């Protein structure tokens, strides 16, 4: 049983060139067809698959089922990782996802200064056993051929795929499975990245792609068939950097004025929308640590969300839905302590919440999370203990080491015998005093 790519989704198309009958045609893969009038434009001669290009470049003798991949940066290799690189085609099972990418060397064009510039190549995909290298075995070292296959495909047998008839089958926009890494410096035809910037540019590009057109405007209208020139990437980078007024090679420096502006911008936000960082610390955003705000210690108080350990904690943070629907909420009106007395007072409310975040040891990074939590929960208690310790006496200016230390030492008075708790025998005087204390008190009535 032979498979036809896109059989069940032939209506899918991209932004490539279309003829009047709805068949998708690419710049280097146009078939013999009648001239079609389009919106006031004169009919353009169509290039066939077997016609020779007078300005260089090889023709594509076979029609690919997919749109091409065009190179726009010089020196970039066309390659895919193992098991990747086969385009998605509805109706084709994974066992038939095998083939190769064929490099098409495109034509050259004349620049305004009269020099010839060669367009960068474009690659087309063909299933194994089809296309210009239908008779070659998978993996054969051929210049301009890159072999690709899925992990489920048997590369020892050709793919059971029919050849594409351009008169009845549309070319499928190239798409890849999720996780596919595209070659750097290439873009997919029809993806919109190479769309011309204006109608005049589109017309000039259409005229340049017609090999049989003899009547052209001046040479200034000659542009590449693709809207992307080889040096366009460098031009885009230069324009972006010029727009930003920055140099990408230089790291951005944060001055005191910049840090102050960043801090003020953060503090102007509502309390629940602030994100502390190096320029605006945790205490500046939310106040000192205590029983009600008991998280944070050490470097995390200084760096805030910039701390390298914070992202793993952010994975525990609840979503907005979990916050509202998974917590106990209470609305309370509080006293407004801000503003002057002569200003109109505003009603201030607090939305108080109580909830919990549950996780177990199967959570990714569990050990690291527990370590960070243990280091930062109630860390203020340890810091307060260190602050309550007697600080080291500071030496005043003009004093040498050791000088003045004895002046700060308070000399206690010697203890009495009672404080010393020493035992002694009673004397005769002591016994006499004790007897007088036992006698009854008599008031002296004698007159003077």
Swiss-Prot record:
Keywords, ordered alphabetically: ADP-ribosylation, Host Golgi apparatus, Phosphoprotein, Ribonucleoprotein, RNA-binding, Transcription, Transcription regulation, Viral nucleoprotein, Virion
Modified residues (Phosphoserine): 167, 191, 390, 423
CDD domains named among the record's database cross-references: CoV_N-CTD, CoV_N-NTD
One Pfam match: CoV_nucleocap
UniProt subunit comment: Homooligomer. Both monomeric and oligomeric forms interact with RNA. Interacts with protein M. Interacts with NSP3; this interaction serves to tether the genome to the newly translated replicase-transcriptase complex at a very early stage of infection.
Role this protein plays: Packages the positive strand viral genome RNA into a helical ribonucleocapsid (RNP) and plays a fundamental role during virion assembly through its interactions with the viral genome and membrane protein M. Plays an important role in enhancing the efficiency of subgenomic viral RNA transcription as well as viral replication.
Name the record gives this protein: Nucleoprotein
UniProt organism field: Bovine coronavirus (strain F15) (BCoV)
């Amino acid at each position: 049983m032979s498979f036809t790519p896109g059989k069940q989704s032939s209506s899918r198309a991209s932004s490539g060139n279309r003829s009047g009958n709805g068949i998708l045609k690419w710049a280097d893969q146009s078939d013999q067809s009648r001239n079609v009038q389009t919106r006031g434009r004169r009919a353009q001669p169509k290039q066939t698959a077997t016609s020779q290009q007078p300005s260089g470049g090889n023709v594509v003798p076979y029609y690919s089922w997919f749109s091409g991949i065009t190179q726009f940066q010089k020196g970039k290799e066309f390659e895919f990782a193992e098991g990747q690189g086969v385009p998605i085609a509805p109706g084709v099972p994974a066992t038939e996802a095998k083939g190769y990418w064929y490099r098409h060397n495109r034509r050259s064009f004349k620049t305004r200064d009269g020099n010839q510039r060669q367009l960068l190549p474009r690659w087309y995909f063909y299933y194994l056993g089809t296309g210009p290298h239908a008779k070659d075995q998978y993996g054969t070292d051929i210049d301009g051929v890159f072999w690709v296959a899925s992990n489920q495909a048997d590369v020892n047998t050709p793919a059971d795929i029919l050849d594409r008839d351009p008169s009845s089958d549309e070319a499928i926009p190239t798409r890849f499975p999720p996780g596919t890494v595209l070659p750097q410096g290439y873009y997919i035809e029809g993806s919109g990245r190479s769309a011309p910037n204006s109608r005049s540019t589109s017309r000039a590009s259409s005229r340049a792609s017609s090999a049989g057109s003899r009547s052209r405007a001046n040479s200034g209208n000659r542009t590449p068939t693709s809207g992307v020139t080889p040096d366009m990437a460098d031009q885009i980078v230069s324009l972006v950097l010029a727009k930003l007024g920055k140099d990408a090679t230089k790291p951005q420096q944060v001055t005191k004025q910049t840090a102050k502006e960043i801090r003020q911008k953060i503090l102007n936000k509502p309390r629940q929308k602030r994100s502390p960082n190096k320029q605006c610390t945790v205490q500046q955003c939310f106040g000192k640590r205590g029983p009600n705000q008991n998280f944070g210690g050490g470097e995390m108080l200084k760096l805030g969300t910039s701390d390298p350990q914070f992202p793993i904690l952010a994975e525990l943070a609840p979503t907005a839905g979990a916050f509202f629907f998974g917590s106990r909420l209470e609305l309370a009106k509080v006293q407004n302590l801000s503003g002057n007395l002569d200003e109109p007072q505003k009603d201030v409310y607090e939305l108080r919440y109580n909830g919990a975040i549950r996780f177990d040891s199967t959570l990714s990074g569990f050990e690291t999370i527990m370590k960070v939590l243990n280091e930062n929960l109630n860390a203020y208690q340890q810091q307060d203990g260190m602050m309550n310790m007697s600080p080291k006496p500071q030496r005043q200016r003009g004093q040498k080491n050791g000088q003045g230390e004895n002046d700060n030492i308070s000399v206690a008075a010697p203890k009495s015998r009672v404080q010393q708790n020493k035992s002694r025998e009673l004397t005769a005087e002591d016994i006499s005093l004790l007897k007088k204390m036992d006698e009854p008190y008599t008031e002296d009535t004698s007159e003077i």
